[in-house]
A protein has these predicted regions:
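Active-site catalytic microenvironments in core metabolic enzymes, especially phosphate/sugar-handling
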Residues: 1-238
Length: 238
């Protein structure tokens, strides 16, 4: 994490904020004459993007070389933004309209929990999650009883399911859940909603852009318009 690409001494006037640094995001930054991209997910040296070579004929190498040749720098975060006050999970709780949000279990842990102003059936809450996060669809499982106390974990936070149960939550909103996690949830007494990795983390980009504008008023800070959810859903009958 930190500055992963670029010149630490370079002057910065325009900043682009995005969840991921993709080819489209890099092209947008170049077109907007930005000097810096700030992202949540690292563009290199993480478990899903290990850097062994930087070659023009590989997708990752092509992206990294484009960034460097354009004079762009990249500052990337990850779990530090997940856990930070006002970070990924606080932004997710706010996007869902949770009241009295607080840590889920460990005071310094990643996930958050809060309550809905009024209880609602699971299906209605799943629809609310989908619309609030502007997701293309959500997966959910559990009985249709009322939902009031909600745990949230942006990104792949399925490992915190037991913490949500221990806290007495009615439902856990996260992403990247497996078939067996859904299957086992009923026996554990918890409802699950998988709203997707991008939709559960993307709300923080708006928060981060606003924070940077306030912290550095001399900079022009823009949230990426080109980075969108890549996963689509086909539902029979639609």
């Amino acid at each position: 994490v930190g500055q992963l690409l670029g010149d630490p001494e370079a002057e910065v006037r325009r900043v682009l904020v995005a969840l991921d640094i993709t080819e489209a995001v890099a092209d947008e930054a170049i077109a907007e004459n930005c000097q810096l991209i700030v992202s949540h997910h690292p563009v290199m040296n993480c478990k899903w993007l290990p850097v062994q070579t930087v070659r023009q004929d590989t997708p990752q190498g092509h992206l990294l070389l484009k960034i460097l040749r354009s004079g762009l720098s990249a500052i990337c975060m990850h779990t530090n933004l997940d856990v930070a006050p006002g970070g990924v999970n606080d932004a997710l709780a706010a996007a869902l309209g949770l009241e009295d949000p607080g840590p889920l279990g460990d005071p310094e842990g990643l996930c958050r929990m809060g309550t809905l102003a009024s209880p609602m059936p699971l299906q209605e809450f799943a629809k609310h999650v989908c619309r609030a996060l502007q997701a293309n669809g959500v997966r959910y499982a559990g009985d249709s009883g009322p939902v009031r106390k909600v745990a949230v974990g942006g990104g792949a936070c399925g490992d915190y399911e037991d913490a949500a149960i221990a806290a007495g939550c009615d439902v856990f909103v996260t992403s990247d859940l497996s078939y067996h996690q859904f299957l086992d949830a009923a026996g554990k007494g918890i409802r699950l909603i998988d709203a997707g990795h991008f939709p559960t983390e993307n709300p923080v980009c708006t928060v981060l852009a606003e924070y940077l504008r306030g912290r550095f008023p001399g900079l022009t800070v823009t949230k990426s318009a080109s980075h969108r959810e890549v996963i689509q859903y086909y539902v029979e009958g639609e």
